[in-house]
């Protein structure tokens, strides 16, 4: 029996080989006890403030919205140590690993940001780190590969399948199946078998808590909409979490890639089917035979054929709205923010920004406050941009 509800509505669960069930139960037990442990919480928030650099700013884009009645704010997770929101939850998971007396960390990565964050946490806590990464992603994110190796991580190239994030996830799970007694699998997003979606949300929820406090200080009211890009969904659930019970539009932006009609996209929430993948029940991209269909996005961090179960649930009850943005639209938003505000966003975050700009342009006379989560800084983005 689990200590926490493993489902979000019909989504979630623990669809893993029986051999991994004790490891998941152990993880859940230690997570629940850590949440009640004042010393654990004190150390976690100390690290967030004094090592990671929280709180992150909420920046008003004055030039971007000139001539309209829209205000667009950016939640600057790109300024966090490591360059992404990923650092938040890996610090928490590393502390859980130590609590469980695990000395080795297994991780998967797509864009490389979770790999970098995992390497950061392992260096800080003196843990052995091995990171699985698709060969395709290694080629387009070699700067992050260098950063991981510099901090002592072993980067394992995955050549199976499409050589992207889904294949790295599969290999990481295989590794954990044979090494779980001494290793902790540090999943990088709010997906996977229970209790990972809950753990990641709880270790990311300070994004939403800070955002609410900051916008109330600046505007004395809540925003009209919160907008975040969706791959697995950790940055989005982090910023959504504190607004779920408020009258605020929650908008998740999936990658439409070359266009939904082409089939070259990564939008399982609105254009996929319910199925079992990566240890969970959620929406995923499938072909007519029910096999996993390859996803596509110019952004490696969004190139994932499924999505976290809490997002699937929020979609099913119509609490959050999920839309899609093409590669071309994301590139345009990337250019506009860079030139208008001097802030260079990652391609992941450019999807969220692109939808915010769409809302602004729809009717410039409407007074509205929009917050886009700028979840990642991408030092490799220039090569991707030039190749596009």
Swiss-Prot record:
UniProt cross-references to InterPro entries, sorted A to Z: Trp_synth_b_CS (IPR006653), Trp_synth_beta (IPR006654), Trp_synth_beta/beta-like (IPR023026), TrpB-like_PALP (IPR001926), TrpB-like_PALP_sf (IPR036052)
Cross-referenced Pfam families: PALP
Catalytic activity: (1S,2R)-1-C-(indol-3-yl)glycerol 3-phosphate + L-serine = D-glyceraldehyde 3-phosphate + L-tryptophan + H2O
SUPFAM superfamilies membership: Tryptophan synthase beta subunit-like PLP-dependent enzymes
EC id: 4.2.1.20
Enzyme class: lyase
NCBIfam families attached to this UniProt entry: trpB
Primary role: The beta subunit is responsible for the synthesis of L-tryptophan from indole and L-serine.
Name under which the protein is recorded: Tryptophan synthase beta chain
Naturally occurring in which organism (per UniProt): Buchnera aphidicola subsp. Acyrthosiphon pisum (strain APS) (Acyrthosiphon pisum symbiotic bacterium)
Gene: trpB
């Amino acid at each position: 029996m689990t200590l926490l509800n493993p489902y979000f509505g019909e989504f979630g669960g623990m669809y893993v080989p029986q051999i991994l069930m004790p490891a998941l139960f152990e993880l859940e037990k230690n997570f629940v006890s850590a949440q009640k442990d004042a010393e654990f919480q004190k150390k976690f928030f100390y690290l967030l403030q004094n090592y990671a650099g929280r709180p992150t700013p909420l920046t008003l884009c004055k030039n971007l919205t000139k001539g309209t009645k829209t205000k667009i704010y950016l939640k600057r997770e790109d300024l966090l140590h490591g360059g992404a929101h990923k650092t938040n939850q890996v610090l928490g998971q590393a502390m859980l690993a130590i609590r469980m007396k695990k000395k080795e960390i297994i991780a998967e990565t797509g864009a490389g940001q979770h790999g970098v964050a995992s390497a950061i946490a392992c260096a800080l806590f003196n843990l052995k780190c091995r990171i699985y990464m698709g060969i395709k992603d290694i080629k387009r994110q070699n700067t992050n590969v260098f950063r991981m190796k510099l901090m002592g991580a072993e980067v394992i190239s995955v050549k199976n399948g499409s050589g992207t994030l889904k294949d790295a996830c599969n290999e990481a799970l295989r590794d954990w199946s044979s090494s779980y007694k001494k290793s902790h699998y540090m999943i990088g997003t709010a997906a996977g078998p229970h209790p990972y979606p809950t753990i990641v949300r709880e270790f990311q929820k300070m994004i939403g808590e800070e955002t609410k406090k900051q916008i109330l200080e600046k505007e004395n009211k809540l925003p009209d909409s919160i907008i975040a890009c969706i791959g697995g969904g950790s940055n989005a659930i982090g910023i959504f979490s504190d607004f779920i019970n408020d009258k605020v539009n929650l908008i998740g932006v999936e990658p439409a890639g070359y266009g939904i009609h082409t089939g070259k996209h990564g939008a399982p929430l609105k254009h996929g089917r319910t199925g079992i993948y990566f240890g969970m029940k959620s929406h995923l991209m499938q072909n007519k035979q029910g096999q996993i269909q390859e996803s596509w996005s110019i952004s490696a961090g969004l190139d994932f054929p499924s999505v976290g179960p809490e997002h699937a649930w929020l979609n099913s009850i119509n609490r959050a709205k999920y839309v899609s943005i093409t590669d071309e639209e994301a590139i345009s938003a990337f250019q506009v923010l860079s030139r208008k505000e001097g802030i260079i966003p990652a391609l992941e975050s450019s999807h969220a920004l692109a939808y915010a700009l769409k809302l602004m342009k729809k009717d410039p006379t409407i007074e509205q406050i929009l917050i886009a989560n700028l979840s990642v800084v991408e030092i490799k983005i220039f090569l991707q941009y030039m190749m596009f």
